[in-house]
Amino acid sequence: MKTIIAEKPSVAREIARIVGATKREEGYFEGGGYAVTWAFGHLVQLAMPDGYGVRGFVRDNLPIIPDTFTLVPRQVRTEKGYKPDSGVVSQIKVIKRLFDTSEHIIVATDAGREGELIFRYLYHYTGCTTPFVRLWISSLTDKAIREGLRKLEDGSKYDNLYLAAKARSESDWLVGINGTQALSIAAGHGTYSVGRVQTPTLAMVCERYWENRRFTSEAFWQLHIATDGCDGEVVKFSSSEKWKEKEPAMELYNKVKAAGCATVTKAERKEKTEETPLLYDLTTLQKEANAKHGFTAEQTLEIAQKLYEKKLITYPRTGSRYIPEDVFAEIPKLLAFIGTQPEWKDKVRAKAAPTRRSVDDGKVTDHHALLVTGEKPLFLSKEDNTIYQMIAGRMVEAFSEKCVKDVTTVTAECAGVEFTVKGSVVKQTGWRAVYGEEKEEITIPGWQEGDTLTPKGSSITEGKTKPKPLHTEATLLSAMETAGKEIEDDALRQAMKDCGIGTPATRASIIETLFKRGYMERCKKSLVPTEKGLALNSVVKTMRIADVAMTGEWEKELARIERGELSDDTFRKEIEAYTREITSELISCDKLFGSRDSGCACPKCGTGRMRFYGKVVRCDNTECGLPVFRLKAGRTLSDDEIKDLLTEGHTKLLKGFKSKQGKSFDAVVAFDGEYNTTFVFSEAKKDKKFSGRKK
């Protein structure tokens, strides 16, 4: 008998149908000489510190660096601590029995780093020695599964993939466990979660937040003239320079207004080609789904995974935006299929050779770019259909013709002021026709250098400089992809992918972790760090744990392990040294977290004392631990203001707060019924009964 192990029951069911394993047993399907079983995600994990006989959150025990990591069944948290998940333990027993009684194992977990780790951890935990082969496929269509089963690969081919996954798992444990415990010990109260990837990601969110909030807008003035264009249209020139002072701008404006003519000093005409966009990888799909439809990164990944399991798209957790030659041969057939759908009727070119920009064998990693499979998308929800049609539409764009424009730039001088105007006319719409996104054309007459223009009007406008906007999930994903470097070019971004932080498969969960930890929140599409997030970042922002570039280097090292260019032992030694350094740094934060008595009892429990710990005031009763963060809407509460809040349940009216939109406001800070702080505004204060009890 052969055992096939899939990553989840739904995939196992499809494979079982294809191999004829139709008899349902407890935890697997059987038939046709096969047993088809499944995991449900990671059934086996690295043990927590107590699994090594080490008590956690003890200063003298840090750093905790096991000689060898111990694997245990996935655990769940209970009132008495962590214990193995009973359902997981039962499934592991089923899998072990099947492994031990099989002639060989076919590994059908997801074809990627985490899928490989799910199987290998199980294999090692069960002490299995049965030989295994790998089913490596990029879609779950019947055709792909059958072809994959005919072309099974030796399991050892993916040893480096496993070693990279194992190194990632162990490094996250070392940094996360030691960093979190060190900082929490330094703080004295509460738990401050840090991680190899989550903390640098939070640092980027906080850095952009402060850059936005501390930005001082400055006024500027710009001049404009208008003249007749083609077919009665008006062409509007704008001054090349912008003035920070109104007086000199007005002085020049009056001269321009009085002038009767302008002279063309330069006329430049060029043909501009806009290449087709590359196909989607997961991160680009997540970015555009967030920007265009407001989907979270996690939501997009969940939908893409669902579409994959429904056989509608190829493997979603891909980091490549290219396809190999053999897949390109199937593109005409797939485009013809897309063209039969109502959404894309008349958008797919008939009998035309697809553009090859997204075709490059050398740029395909484990999986090629996202494609639809040719299976009909029936009975999809609105959200699922949105993601499916995005992938289909991108395929149509990527394999259409280039967009070609004639671009004209004209410079003219009037009363000593230089003015410019740019116009474009589309010669070949190409891929821009797919969504009809091409902007309205601006036709510039055939002016030549030395031509005299007669202005039909002039104006002066006032503008204001704007800060960089707060991060959205789309822009944060871009920053994670390039370790904070601002790169717009698709090809350059693709070249940087090994230096980013996180991977396409993990970035969504990293962002969600920051929400779950209470470090940031969504304000419409913007990501805003919470008081807790800002407080944490203020402590660690200059430390190595928050270094975005270095985290990008770790990802690069993991990619080298995957390619067989770096030993996992070398990486392990480096990450252990790093763990010792960041643990020492974070433990020393007790200087920053030095506590002192506020002189106030806890308003919530009444038995504890409220103590100042740097950016937070916290109850010293461990069963209560009420936290009050001093930083509120860009303003830090003083000791006296905190004492008013603790003793009266509210402060006096305070000035100098700044809203998430950057507007200043005045308010009272008060406790609500759950002892969370809230703002009460002056007009409402007269009728407001504060919920927090006075002690």
Task: Set out the residue ranges of the language-model regions.
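Basic, low-complexity terminal or inter-domain segments flanking catalytic cores
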Residues: 2, 81-83, 125, 130, ...
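Short strand-coil-strand connectors
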Residues: 30-32, 226-230, 413-417, 661
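Metal- or metallocofactor-binding catalytic centers and their adjacent structured scaffolds
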Residues: 244-280, 286
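Amphipathic alpha-helical transducer elements in NTP-driven molecular machines
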Residues: 9-16, 33-36, 40, 59-62, ...
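Intrinsically disordered, low-complexity regulatory segments
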Residues: 1-169, 173, 179, 467
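C-terminal or mid-to-C-terminal helical accessory/interaction module adjacent to the motor/catalytic core
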Residues: 87, 142-227, 269-270
